[in-house]
């Protein structure tokens, strides 16, 4: 028999009754039932109940073991009594009567429990992550992550992609965040950078004559803490394709990612045909470029109903600003004054003056609009709004006014809030879509200049002719995002593979040819030697896994994450370098203000 085990703790069944077996694992818990000791023994695979009676030579050792001790058990498989069968456990029909127990490793008193879902401070959980990972939910999340990545690899291979690895030590590149820099000992005073994404390398792979590339790529970004991102590093399914247009990438990757979701959706419906929603339409309908389409609320412009109306606040806004609009946010079943007042209070908490509303209710046989807005604009306009928004008895609508560019994010938040408060969101499905036609440029109000709105390497729609035109802020990019349940899970674009178009795009944001050649030298040089039209995307693995397992945050699907202050409490990183290490790297640490 093997030194430690003949079976795992999830393997034995009623058909094994009478067998002599050996198991090893962690003591999940110990229970004393009238002299009999019951030990739940746990390993990576599952749980088996061990029984030690006072007549067994194993009993003396069994009395000493405590939670999370590691033990080896030799014993005989016996059937449980019918009244003690645990139908929720794969091994629930049997138990092991112990003949011998060996303690392989004792454990100190635990700083946090490893069963159940303990509400412990996150810093304690991260410091003792090796204990936290023993919890069933977290353990299963990590295993699911591995299976999801394996499924991605399989499906990418099935549609003709080849996996390549790209360098981790590379040159600094402005991807939109700060780089993590690595000093070079051999070349003092110079630095490598950890890649924010394999963007330039994957394009170079296409220029090198390969056709369909992918990898599970680690990405490193020195960003300020954000609730929806892991500090430091994250992983993405990165891919690129040669000789493709936008539709080719979308038509290739939609079935791949839909298939991944269907495999791990645990029976929840998954969108079969993804909508392709232009960015401008998404912002107008949903107030977001990553809309949760499980929420049925769609906003509409209702400016005409308030123009020259008795509600002077909105009427004056429309009269004094040609850019101004009034948007209506329909809220089915929201037709109570209490709910409308709650939404108004929420808006004030968000820094807004309030949130105008109308709600409709039956007065006898007549459907009437109620609330201050309805009184001010009159019955005819109120009825026209109701009909446009498709509302009925017991429904409500909320209104925002001004320049849409200034209120759109608040309007989107109000849509989300109303959908959640009214339980309009179907949480038992995965709703996926594409967002397309992103703006290529945006106006930087602080610096009073044009900037790239998203990925600077994307091809502008209309090419160099559009860049030479006058309506620069009207140019759209061949860029697209995949969105699921309100989360951006993938982003990509058709690349700007023409050197002169690339230079012109960067000149528009203030970077001259010399700067482009210096900062993107490898890519720019490669484009001089025959670059195929190409495009691709990257899907965020951490977010995909989080959605599929139903985790509340990204740390629940990551094995060893940092905390929100970008500190690794388990390994105590970052840490100070020794004087010798600094000398070898020709570095000196400048004193901070507190040290000065």
From Swiss-Prot:
Binding partners and assembly: Homodimer.
Residues the record lists as binding ATP: 221-223, 488, 540-543
Record EC number: 6.1.1.23
Species this protein is from: Mesorhizobium japonicum (strain LMG 29417 / CECT 9101 / MAFF 303099)
Annotated region (Aspartate), positions in chain: 199-202
Any single GO BP term: aspartyl-tRNA aminoacylation
Keywords: Aminoacyl-tRNA synthetase, ATP-binding, Cytoplasm, Ligase, Nucleotide-binding, Protein biosynthesis
Entry-linked NCBIfam families: aspS_bact (TIGR00459), PRK00476.1 (NF001750)
Main location: cytoplasm
Similarity comment: Belongs to the class-II aminoacyl-tRNA synthetase family. Type 1 subfamily.
Keyword rRNA-binding belongs to the record: no
Entry GO MF terms: aspartate-tRNA ligase activity; aspartate-tRNA(Asn) ligase activity; ATP binding; nucleic acid binding
Protein known as: Aspartate--tRNA(Asp/Asn) ligase
Chemical reaction(s) catalysed: tRNA(Asx) + L-aspartate + ATP = L-aspartyl-tRNA(Asx) + AMP + diphosphate
The protein's role, per its UniProt record: Aspartyl-tRNA synthetase with relaxed tRNA specificity since it is able to aspartylate not only its cognate tRNA(Asp) but also tRNA(Asn). Reaction proceeds in two steps: L-aspartate is first activated by ATP to form Asp-AMP and then transferred to the acceptor end of tRNA(Asp/Asn).
Lineage, broadest ranks: Bacteria, Pseudomonadati, Pseudomonadota, Alphaproteobacteria, Hyphomicrobiales
């Amino acid at each position: 028999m093997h030194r430690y085990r003949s079976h795992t703790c999830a393997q034995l069944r009623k058909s094994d009754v009478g067998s002599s077996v050996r198991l090893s694992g962690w003591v999940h818990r110990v229970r004393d039932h009238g002299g009999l000791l019951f030990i739940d023994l746990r390993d990576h695979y599952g749980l088996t109940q061990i029984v030690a009676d006072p007549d067994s030579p194993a009993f003396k050792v069994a009395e000493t073991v405590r939670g999370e001790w590691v033990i080896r058990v030799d014993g005989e498989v016996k059937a449980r009594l019918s009244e003690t069968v645990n139908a929720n456990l794969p091994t629930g029909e049997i138990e092991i009567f112990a003949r011998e127990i060996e303690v392989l490793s004792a454990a100190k008193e635990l700083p946090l429990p490893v069963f159940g879902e303990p509400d412990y401070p996150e810093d304690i959980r991260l410091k003792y992550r090796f204990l936290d990972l023993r919890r069933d939910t977290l353990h299963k999340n990590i295993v699911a992550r591995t299976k999801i990545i394996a499924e991605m690899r399989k499906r990418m291979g099935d549609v003709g992609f080849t996996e390549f690895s790209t360098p981790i030590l590379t040159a600094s590149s402005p991807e939109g965040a700060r780089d993590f820099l690595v000093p070079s000992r051999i070349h003092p005073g110079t630095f490598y950078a950890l890649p924010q994404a394999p963007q330039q390398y994957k394009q170079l792979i296409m220029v090198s004559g390969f056709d369909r590339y992918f990898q599970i790529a680690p990405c490193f970004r020195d960003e300020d803490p954000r609730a929806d991102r892991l500090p430091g590093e994250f992983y993405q399914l990165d891919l690129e394709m040669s000789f493709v247009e936008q539709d080719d990438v979308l038509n290739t990757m939609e079935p791949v990612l839909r298939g991944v979701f269907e495999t791990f959706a645990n029976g929840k419906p998954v969108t079969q045909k993804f909508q392709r929603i232009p960015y401008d339409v998404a912002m107008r309908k949903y107030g977001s470029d990553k809309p949760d389409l499980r929420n049925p609320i769609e906003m509409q412009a209702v400016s005409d109903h308030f123009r020259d109306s008795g509600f002077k606040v909105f009427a004056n806004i429309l009269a004094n600003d040609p850019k101004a609009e009034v948007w209506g946010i329909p809220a089915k079943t929201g037709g109570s004054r209490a709910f409308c007042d709650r939404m108004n209070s929420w808006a004030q908490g968000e820094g807004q003056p309030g949130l105008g509303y109308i709600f409709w209710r039956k007065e006898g046989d007549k459907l009437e609009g109620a609330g201050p807005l309805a009184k001010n604009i009159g019955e005819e306009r109120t009825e026209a709004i109701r009909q446009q928004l498709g509302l009925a008895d017991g429904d409500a609508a909320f209104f925002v006014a001004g320049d849409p560019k200034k209120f759109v994010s608040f309007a989107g938040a109000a849509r989300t809030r109303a959908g959640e408060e009214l339980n309009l969101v179907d949480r038992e499905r995965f709703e996926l879509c594409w967002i397309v036609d992103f703006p290529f440029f945006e106006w930087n109000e602080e610096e009073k200049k044009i900037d790239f709105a998203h990925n600077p390497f994307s091809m502008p729609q209309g090419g160099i002719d559009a860049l030479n035109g006058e309506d620069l802020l009207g140019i759209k990019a061949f860029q697209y995002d995949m969105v699921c349940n309100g989360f951006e899970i993938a982003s990509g674009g058709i690349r700007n593979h023409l050197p002169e178009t690339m230079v012109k795009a960067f000149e528009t944001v203030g970077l001259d040819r010399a700067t482009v050649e210096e900062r993107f030298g490898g890519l720019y040089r490669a484009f001089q030697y025959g670059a195929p039209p190409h495009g691709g995307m990257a899907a965020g693995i951490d977010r995909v896994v989080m959605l599929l397992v139903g985790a509340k945050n990204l740390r629940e699907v990551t094995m060893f994450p940092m905390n929100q202050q970008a500190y690794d409490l388990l390994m105590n990183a970052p840490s100070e370098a020794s004087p010798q290490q600094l000398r070898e790297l020709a570095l000196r640490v400048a004193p901070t203000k507190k040290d000065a």
